[in-house]
């Protein structure tokens, strides 16, 4: 197990009891005020040519782990809730350049994370592939014509991002200028199996019987669909990178539904194909893979060729680091539910995660997206502690 010694230079007085303070402990750091009442340590000047997150991923020496949180732009923030009142439809918010930029920057302006992720959805490309869908409040994704036959799959079109989702490229270009290398601008896409799960099931699912019936009864049909998604997502990643994204995360949210042997057939080869394709044209673009429920798959994930594996909270960080090996960086993996706890509890969990991750090649994050109802002041506290860490 890797280990490191680190100190905390921006911990609030109420949290000090959780740590042994070093002699140079700074009790009065400069702070940024949070609209929710919390504070975040003011960031130091960052190398204008290389965001901290990119240095960490590439194995360079860094003073602390970079930090950003999945779903950091969104529903837990009061400012986002106000926008939702004005623009109640999700796609009205996620397909409008000005709103995408505004929402993406909301957490950046308050908390200064080391990664600023595009506000969007993994299903955004579907319309451009001739798969009509919507995201309905209280119900989630709805696929109007689920794909379940070879004829259905045949109708799926080639995805051309610059024609189908130009607002994504425009938003990323603006974000890159706004953030100005003080943080890494992050794009993201859905993994082929996860996208296929949505379009076959017709939306979210509890049992995944339809996608599994297709996988086990008509695997050729599913493979044809997965191939179309793999080709399209590779294009989408390149488009995002060319538009300004400095790293891209691939979400395989439903990998948890696959046994290891089925992951090797229906997910791994398509993830590897995406990575190989992107690396041909963008060899230095960091690619992050988040596969939910991947505790039984960890040794297989580096085989995709990604630069970073993002762990969910069901994997012990020290065990995950050991099983993944030294050649990939690691991201995660605080339980999102921890943010409902006390500030001392949150601090202790951050402490535990960073210690187990070891020094370097670690991006501090949650093990899943932020949950609805998370107190904004606890979110602020997470960043205050995280940005005060020192190896």
From Swiss-Prot:
InterPro entries: UROD/MetE-like_sf (IPR038071), Uroporphyrinogen_deCO2ase_HemE (IPR006361), Uroporphyrinogen_deCOase (IPR000257)
EC class (word): lyase
Superkingdom of origin: Eukaryota
Reaction catalysed by this enzyme: uroporphyrinogen III + 4 H(+) = coproporphyrinogen III + 4 CO2
EC number(s) per entry: 4.1.1.37
Principal location listed in the UniProt entry: plastid
GO cellular component: chloroplast
CDD domains xref list: URO-D
Chain positions recorded as substrate binding sites: 71-75, 90, 120-121, 198, 253, 368
Pathway(s) where this gene product acts: Porphyrin-containing compound metabolism; protoporphyrin-IX biosynthesis; coproporphyrinogen-III from 5-aminolevulinate: step 4/4
Biological process terms in GO annotation: chlorophyll biosynthetic process; protoporphyrinogen IX biosynthetic process
Assembly, per entry: Homodimer.
Stated family: Belongs to the uroporphyrinogen decarboxylase family.
Identification of the protein by name: Uroporphyrinogen decarboxylase, chloroplastic
């Amino acid at each position: 197990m890797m280990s490191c010694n680190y100190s905390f230079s921006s911990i609030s007085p109420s949290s000090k009891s959780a740590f042994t303070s070093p002699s140079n402990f700074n009790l009065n750091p400069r702070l940024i005020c949070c609209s929710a009442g919390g504070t975040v340590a003011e960031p130091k000047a960052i190398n204008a040519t290389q965001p901290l997150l990119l240095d960490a991923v590439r194995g360079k020496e860094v003073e602390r782990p970079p930090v950003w949180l999945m779903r950091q732009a969104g529903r837990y923030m009061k400012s986002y809730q106000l926008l939702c009142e004005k623009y109640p439809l999700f796609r009205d918010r996620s397909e409008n350049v000005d709103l995408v930029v505004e929402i993406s920057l909301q957490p950046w302006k308050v908390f200064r994370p080391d990664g600023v992720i595009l506000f969007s959805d993994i299903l955004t490309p579907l319309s451009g592939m001739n798969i009509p869908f919507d995201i309905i409040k209280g119900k989630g994704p709805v696929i109007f014509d689920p794909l379940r036959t070879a004829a259905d799959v045949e109708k799926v079109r080639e995805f051309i991002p610059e024609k189908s989702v130009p607002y994504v490229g425009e938003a990323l270009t603006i974000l890159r200028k706004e953030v100005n290398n003080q943080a890494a601008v992050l794009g993201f896409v859905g993994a082929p199996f996860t996208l296929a799960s949505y379009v076959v099931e017709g939306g979210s699912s509890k049992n995944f019987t339809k996608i599994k019936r297709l996988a086990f009864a008509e695997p050729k049909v599913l493979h044809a669909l997965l191939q179309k998604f793999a080709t399209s997502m590779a294009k989408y990643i390149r488009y995002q990178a060319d538009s300004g994204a400095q790293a891209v995360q691939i979400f395989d949210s439903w990998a948890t539904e696959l046994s290891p042997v089925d992951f090797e057939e229906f997910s791994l080869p398509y993830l590897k194909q995406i990575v190989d394709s992107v690396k041909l044209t963008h060899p230095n673009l960091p690619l992050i893979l988040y596969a939910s429920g991947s505790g039984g798959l960890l040794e297989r994930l580096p085989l995709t060729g990604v630069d970073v594996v993002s762990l969910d909270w069901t994997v012990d960080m020290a065990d995950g680091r050991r099983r993944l090996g030294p050649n990939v960086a690691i991201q995660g993996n605080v339980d999102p539910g921890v943010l409902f706890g006390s500030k001392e509890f949150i601090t202790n969990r951050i402490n535990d995660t960073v210690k187990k991750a070891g020094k370097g090649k670690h991006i501090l994050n949650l093990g899943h997206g932020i949950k609805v109802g998370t107190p904004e002041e606890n979110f602020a506290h997470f960043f205050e502690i995280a940005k005060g860490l020192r190896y």
